[in-house]
From Swiss-Prot:
Pathway: Aminoacyl-tRNA biosynthesis; selenocysteinyl-tRNA(Sec) biosynthesis; selenocysteinyl-tRNA(Sec) from L-seryl-tRNA(Sec) (bacterial route): step 1/1
Family: Belongs to the SelA family.
GO cellular component: cytoplasm
Residues carrying N6-(pyridoxal phosphate)lysine: 282
Keyword Transcription regulation: no
Localization (cell): Cytoplasm
SUPFAM superfamilies per the UniProt record, alphabetical: PLP-dependent transferases (SSF53383)
Principal localisation: cytoplasm
Catalyzed reaction equations: L-seryl-tRNA(Sec) + selenophosphate + H(+) = L-selenocysteinyl-tRNA(Sec) + phosphate
Gene: selA
GO term, biological process aspect, one: conversion of seryl-tRNAsec to selenocys-tRNAsec
Role played: Converts seryl-tRNA(Sec) to selenocysteinyl-tRNA(Sec) required for selenoprotein biosynthesis.
Entry's EC annotation: 2.9.1.1
Designated name of the protein: L-seryl-tRNA(Sec) selenium transferase
């Protein structure tokens, strides 16, 4: 006798009354999945329909749990890559809503009734804000690096310091991107010291560009030196080459004074190289995008590359980026949430923590601590903050809070909530959620 005959038919499971409330495609998928999984591990004479249905409902609930959800970032990492990096202000979202939910003039000129430029309005604002000749936007900074190198240096050679051949999250490695772009890499210097003469001695007839990459996600300390972009640009100009700064994470305006030391400002850097690029959702505090600034003739070459079609941004990205740029131009920095969280003073953070502590039914301790910038930015810098610590097994508490979409951290064997990254409009929700939890 075929032992699998004891399994109920898939259709019988799908049509069961207990699964009636679930959409057909979802319950059909999980009915097939659970039956297949149990058949692989089938050592019993029979299996009940009730057990199958229990497993199916469990899988469906897990599926819904895995959907994209909002969380409260109590980790103390402001630009938390795994939590979506920069947060968009509600007012900026409302300003974009009409564009996103309707047809729009994303690529249509309302003046002459003809096809328009997808980037026109955003590029105009970028040129105003950064005082650059021209600009371009692609879907992230990795795409920007690839497009710049492929457009300007294909089948040529690029010089880069060994100390700047970085790897960022997701195993994105600068040398691999250079290779994928059809460009040959010439490494100069050592991991801790690179001099101007190293670049100069490496130049040959096949050299097209000198690349500088900002070490945004790690810091070199002790016996080390590097060449600034201004000097590299002068060398490139003298040798009739191009200079490119892969900035990754740069700041624009109104950043906490404790953070800006030795941290490059975009408007200054754009005057010191031929072309540069950075991420829109890091210190700039907007949406994911690769923003490229530079000489007009170079940006034109990028626009002619067929790859741009594959890397272009959609109306959602353009809408949110446009509103972020307007906020910067109007000096309305409160609407750039990343800046606000980095700039919040300690007394304001303490007030948030005290308000929550006062209303919680569980015992906590208020302590000073340190927050991080995150997002591959400023690894050697931290910001003062206040945390609430909870009594009990730290790992169990971290898991329990995570199930309620509250992401804290473990510090000194204690589970803590960091109030620099908890926004004021989340406090009441945080209080209600914690107070509804049991057996902490």
């Amino acid at each position: 006798m075929n032992k699998f005959r004891t399994f109920p038919q898939i259709n019988t499971l799908i049509e069961d009354e207990s699964l009636k409330s679930y959409p057909f495609y979802i319950k059909a998928f999980f009915c097939k999945k659970v039956v297949a999984k149990l058949k692989e591990n089938f050592f019993q004479d029979e299996i009940s329909k009730d057990k199958l249905l229990l497993e199916i409902k469990k899988e469906i609930k897990t599926f819904y749990r895995k959907d994209l959800q909002s969380v409260i970032n109590a980790s103390g990492v402001v630009i938390h890559t795994n939590l979506g990096r920069s947060v968009i202000h509600e007012e900026l979202y409302e300003a974009c809503k009409d564009i996103i939910c309707n047809y729009s003039n994303v690529e249509f000129d309302l003046e002459n009734g003809k096809r328009g430029s997808r980037y026109a309005l955003v590029l105009e604002k970028l040129k105003m804000l950064f005082e650059c000749e021209d600009a371009l936007v692609v879907n992230n900074n990795a795409a920007a690096v690839f497009l710049v190198l492929n457009s300007l240096c294909y089948d040529k050679e690029v010089i880069s310091s060994r100390g700047e051949l970085v790897e960022i999250g997701g195993s994105f490695r600068v040398p691999e991107v250079i290779k994928a772009a059809g460009v040959k890499l010439c490494e100069v210097g050592t991991s801790n010291k690179t001099h101007l003469k190293d670049y100069e001695q490496a130049i040959n007839e096949n050299t097209a560009l000198i690349l500088k990459t900002h070490k945004s996600n790690f810091a070199l300390m002790g016996f080390h030196s590097e060449v600034n972009i201004k000097d590299l640009h002068e060398l490139a100009k003298e040798k009739e080459l191009l200079s490119y700064y892969d900035l990754g994470s740069g700041w624009c305006e109104n950043l906490n004074e404790k953070l800006i030391k030795n941290e490059p400002k975009i408007r200054k850097l754009v005057q010191e190289c031929d072309i540069l690029s950075f991420s829109g959702d890091k210190l700039f505090g907007s949406v994911q995008a690769g923003i490229i600034l530079g000489k007009k003739e170079l940006i034109e070459k990028l626009k002619q590359n067929q790859l741009l079609r594959m890397l272009r941004v959609d109306k959602l990205t353009l809408s949110f980026l446009n509103e972020s740029l307007k906020a910067y131009l109007q000096k309305d920095y409160e609407k750039i949430i990343t800046l606000k969280l980095l700039n919040d003073d300690l007394s304001f953070i303490e007030k948030k923590a005290l308000r929550v502590q006062k209303e919680l039914k569980f015992q906590t301790q208020l302590k000073k601590s340190k927050s991080l910038v995150g997002g591959g930015s400023m690894p050697d810098k931290s910001l003062d903050t206040y945390i609430l610590t909870f009594q009990g097994d730290a790992l169990k508490l971290q898991t329990r809070f995570r199930k309620e979409n509250i992401i804290g951290r473990i510090e000194n064997d204690e589970f803590v909530l960091d109030f620099r990254t908890i926004r004021e409009n989340e406090l009441q929700k945080l209080i209600l959620t914690i107070n509804q939890m049991e057996n902490l």
